[in-house]
Amino acid sequence: MKDLLKFLKAQTKTEEFDAIKIALASPDMIRSWSFGEVKKPETINYRTFKPERDGLFCARIFGPVKDYECLCGKYKRLKHRGVICEKCGVEVTQTKVRRERMGHIELASPTAHIWFLKSLPSRIGLLLDMPLRDIERVLYFESYVVIEGGMTNLEKRQILTEEQYLDALEEFGDEFDAKMGAEAIQALLKNMDLEQECETLREELNETNSETKRKKLTKRIKLLEAFVQSGNKPEWMILTVLPVLPPDLRPLVPLDGGRFATSDLNDLYRRVINRNNRLKRLLDLAAPDIIVRNEKRMLQEAVDALLDNGRRGRAITGSNKRPLKSLADMIKGKQGRFRQNLLGKRVDYSGRSVITVGPYLRLHQCGLPKKMALELFKPFIYGKLELRGLATTIKAAKKMVEREESVVWDILDEVIREHPVLLNRAPTLHRLGIQAFEPVLIEGKAIQLHPLVCAAYNADFDGDQMAVHVPLTLEAQLEARALMMSTNNILSPANGEPIIVPSQDVVLGLYYMTRDCVNAKGEGMVLTGPKEAERVYRAGLASLHARVKVRITEHEKNEQDEWVAKTSIIDTTIGRAILWMIVPKGLPYSIVNQALGKKAISKMLNTCYRILGLKPTVIFADQTMYTGFAYAARSGASVGIDDMVIPEKKVEIITEAEAEVAEIQQQFQSGLVTAGERYNKVIDIWAAANERVAKAMMENLSTEVVINRDGVEERQVSFNSIFMMADSGARGSAAQIRQLAGMRGLMAKPDGSIIETPITANFREGLNVLQYFISTHGARKGLADTALKTANSGYLTRRLVDVAQDLVVTEDDCGTHEGIMMTPVIEGGDVKEPLRERVLGRVTAEDVLKPGTADILLPRNTLLHEQQCDLLEEHSVDSLKVRSVVSCETDFGVCAHCYGRDLARGHIINKGEAIGVIAAQSIGEPGTQLTMRTFHIGGAASRAAAESSIQVKNKGTLKLINAKSVTNSAGKLVITSRNVELKMIDEFGRTKESYKVPYGSTMAKGDGEQVAAGETVANWDPHTMPVITEVSGFIRFTDMIDGQTITRQTDDLTGLSSLVILDSAERTAGGKDLRPALKIVDANGNDVMIPGSDMPAQYFLPGKAIVQLEDGIKISSGDTLARVPQESGGTKDITGGLPRVADLFEARRPKEPAILAEISGIISFGKETKGKRRLVITPIDGSDHYEEMIPKWRQLNVFEGERVERGDVVSDGPESPHDILRLRGVHAVTRYITNEVQEVYRLQGVKINDKHIEVIVRQMLRKATIASAGSTDFLDGEQVEFSRVKIANRELEANGKISATFARDLLGITKASLATESFISAASFQETTRVLTEAAVAGKRDELRGLKENVIVGRLIPAGTGYAYHQDRMRRKAAGEAPVVPQVTADEASASLAELLNAGLGGRDDE
């Protein structure tokens, strides 16, 4: 009978809902929820353990303690259900109602709700327009507030102290009304006429001009309107009735020994009830005012502590001095309701164990210990045992399994067949951290994992553990097989490259197998095919590396899609011919006819996937692994101490370097160089020496001399084990070999600065004590950093997921013509990322034309696959416009065309794909990887020698962009402008190289000249920045007063003296406002003007600048007037990288940002004030000019009379993304953030597709600020969801009304997450109290659009397989249909129950 009831209950559908609204609860509403008033603070009777009547656990109010049984025991059993016992007043029903029935407490005096009082900005304060301090004084009974002034001179809401109140009473009697406590505030709130107030405020807003006042008024108007629209009443922010949480949510558990463990809430409620009852009694007794007042204050404090302990004053502590956990603490933070229970749940049917290698497994398999499988698949086994009639009841089946009878194992095999399990390794940083496999039963207790999936899991076998989960329902198994099977996850969603790539042993084996060797055994044989090659090798007639000729048959498809065979005799080696046997049909032989390193193998698998598709690739990957393992074992490659060959040149190189260092030291002592310069130069010398040693060592290791068949000596690539491991990419790198056999080099201190004495020894020679100490210095920092950065990186991922969680592909094409221009990323002489890699998998936004013609190469809306990219390269297309997520026009989502290819699948993305989460994981996952990988080079400083010249790599035409230059006395060009770019253009007009040329460089070639490859075109001193004059004349010192702004440094040895400008911090008071400068005058002492402007030539000198000229000396243009020493850089490491990425995504303004031109026009300088210059830009069309004050110490890039465009850099510095957005637009800011983030990851060799970063940028740009509201109901200056503005404007344009104008805003990811439309999502992220308070006051509706909200309310997410369900609901809602609820009769129910039982609890009978 009980089962039948449960079954009936399961048949009733849960109610469907479309949105969740949060609002203030009115006292009547609280009473309507309640099942009775809690009058006593007692909980349960400690002798009988029965709840006390009218107490906090009262059974009459909250429901029975035992199922279907009243408290006194008069009614028991199901037949009485719904009866209310006349003796104890308890309803006979299930005990789980104690989780949902609420009670209430009638408060004897109103109390303010602390959230609306103290959560900043205080809602009560904003509404009443009173300072929080005053409201608190009223609430806590320190002063009176005037409620009605009547005919007196007292203002409404005026605060009166006790004395003032008494005086007023004497003067006016009862003409006026003033109260204290929450009653007073309640009265004030009740008397407010919201609509009237709104009107007056709007009028005020139109009249006022002051910015601060406007801000305050808009805030108040918004709050008032929220109250009007939501139907909340302001006086509901003051509680008169307090709801009581259901008792099962604040349990009281008896421990042994007569003590109780209780939830803190019970204590807090007890305090409230006690104080409330005492207050009631005092009021009945008409006690003196002062006593009542004190009791009311205490009640207010008790209610505050219950709602949010510690928000005001000291937190109330329990018996053990620990603050009590209040209602607010229950929901916020990592341990709160949201993050602990709603977003993270525990999973049953799971197990965990250590993992070991399963080298014989297929890619879709994993080894599952029998013990574990038996436990996990128990329900299925029970079902099968009953179905087969081997056990009559579940109990019998249970016994059989416990005895582990032989039949049980057979049934386990059946149950497990084709039933995938999920394997997960923590931390799950991206979706590949959980994959599905088919279990293979094994002996032992460790889970076996396929080696190729280790890269995706970031797993190794040094004791890692993994968890196993069993998908129970048919749908879950289907999803696991179709979407999560390891064979379906060959490509990484972050960059679209294979992630199932052999590494380590396999790579070494394949590399060893495909190497060739001069004069090996069997060289010159001619073989009939791979089979014979294998026979010859097995018979010992030929070596694996012998160069032979083999007949090879290749296949390729013709136009009719049929395989065509092509046979030829190819020069190759035995090993490569053997490897060819496992290469799938359709790949060219050239793919294996080379020494295969890790990159080549990856490329081979990628090619295989693109040409042949999924299945052959999976089989091929497995085969490469088996072969690789086999031949790695055959090779017997191992590391011996003699494999580390130390180059002979090492001693000589080190001696030379030491001599150079001694020379610099000498110069330093003679005063020719400063301490900073000396340090930098020493570091450079050692860095260069280290490079030379490394080069010599690698030459030594990488080649060996052998005698070929003709008896002649020949050099070939060496078979040294260490070299082979590094060369193949199996393990180790040149940097590590350098430490083993070269020299360890420079090390970093914990603060990142480089220690100038390098470690000249290597690990083979061994380190002495000092060297060892220096080593540990940096290595420790590496480990400490790792721990910190893992946490940081995890937090970054969490913020990214939170900001992007609701972004899903919702339609096929939004039809926009917008997009972003893509060009190759060029840094220095290298194309860091060619165009094809940037546009692959994107959709063209405009027709792509053949360069120089009007012929269409590719039409608009073409998805660029590999073939199309080849076409672009053929026609040498240099830039093209592609669709981008940032410019997608879809409201609430993104369209498939703007996103392009699904990187993990290789076709255009499907609707319902959760691209936001994928993007967040793709960016966050390497963050952790990188942070974990800092210490691998043992803190060895990897700082390259400072650049001091530009040497071009390709021949072509030199092009200088924004360059100004002068010719110096030697006839060379000297650059005098700041952001100069130098580009090399090839004959097709494509940019091949691009360099930044620093200020003060000497150019060997000018703009437009032809340059040969390898030519040096520019030189500069990397350690100092010169100040260069553009005019000739005589020097005149201004404001250079000894001891105030400058100091003379005379060299003891050389007697040369130079002037050093003091930093403003080092100057005396008199020197603070002086501005040391060098002025250039002509022979008569008149100012010389800068050419092309009417500004006198004078050069302001920054602090620390060194001048080696005297007053009045003659100089000519292009000469150096002064040198500013550059600070030495620390080491480049992702440490700088991770905070940098976080700063970019948080859109933080840099400390001293670049100053950009606000409008286009001509520059001039206005009147100067103390410490600032006035920059004036006058537009050419003569409209209003723009002024800005710039601190004098800022170096300006512009001169008087120069023309600038809006958004040009006026003064150097890191650019602020907000300025870029404001002045250059959305695309510029997207490009900036994308490039800067990619820069950090590229340094670490991590590839991430640009799309992911653009997705995050789109989410950062989702708000806009209204400039003028037009006919919309937005307020000027209000921040609104961008899509809402777009929708509103579309409606207005359709009706021919005035639309709103707006400016896009860039929000940092934390801000953007908190500003989302969904309050549930925001509350579960951070600042829960604030978010909920705001939402409740505004009466917000959550439409449950994102993923997070849906997870929290416990239904399918609107993405992936849940997308269809939500689309269906939307359709039904639009059609106005009622949700279909199947009506079930009792007969049908019992029939289907019987059917269920016969089928063995839903076991599958097809096996």
UniProtKB/Swiss-Prot annotation:
EC number: 2.7.7.6
Matching SUPFAM superfamilies: beta and beta-prime subunits of DNA dependent RNA-polymerase
UniProt GO MF annotations: DNA binding; DNA-directed RNA polymerase activity; magnesium ion binding; zinc ion binding
EC class of the enzyme, as a word: transferase
Binding positions (Mg(2+)): 460, 462, 464
GO CC annotations, alphabetized: DNA-directed RNA polymerase complex
Residues that hold Zn(2+) 2 according to the record: 814, 888, 895, 898
Keywords: DNA-directed RNA polymerase, Magnesium, Metal-binding, Nucleotidyltransferase, Transcription, Transferase, Zinc
Pfam families the UniProt entry points to: RNA_pol_Rpb1_1, RNA_pol_Rpb1_2, RNA_pol_Rpb1_3, RNA_pol_Rpb1_4, RNA_pol_Rpb1_5
Chain sites annotated for binding Zn(2+) 1: 70, 72, 85, 88
GO biological process: DNA-templated transcription
Family as reported in the entry's similarity comment: Belongs to the RNA polymerase beta' chain family.
Self-association and partners: The RNAP catalytic core consists of 2 alpha, 1 beta, 1 beta' and 1 omega subunit. When a sigma factor is associated with the core the holoenzyme is formed, which can initiate transcription.
Function of the protein: DNA-dependent RNA polymerase catalyzes the transcription of DNA into RNA using the four ribonucleoside triphosphates as substrates.
Name under which the protein is recorded: DNA-directed RNA polymerase subunit beta'
Organism: Erwinia tasmaniensis (strain DSM 17950 / CFBP 7177 / CIP 109463 / NCPPB 4357 / Et1/99)
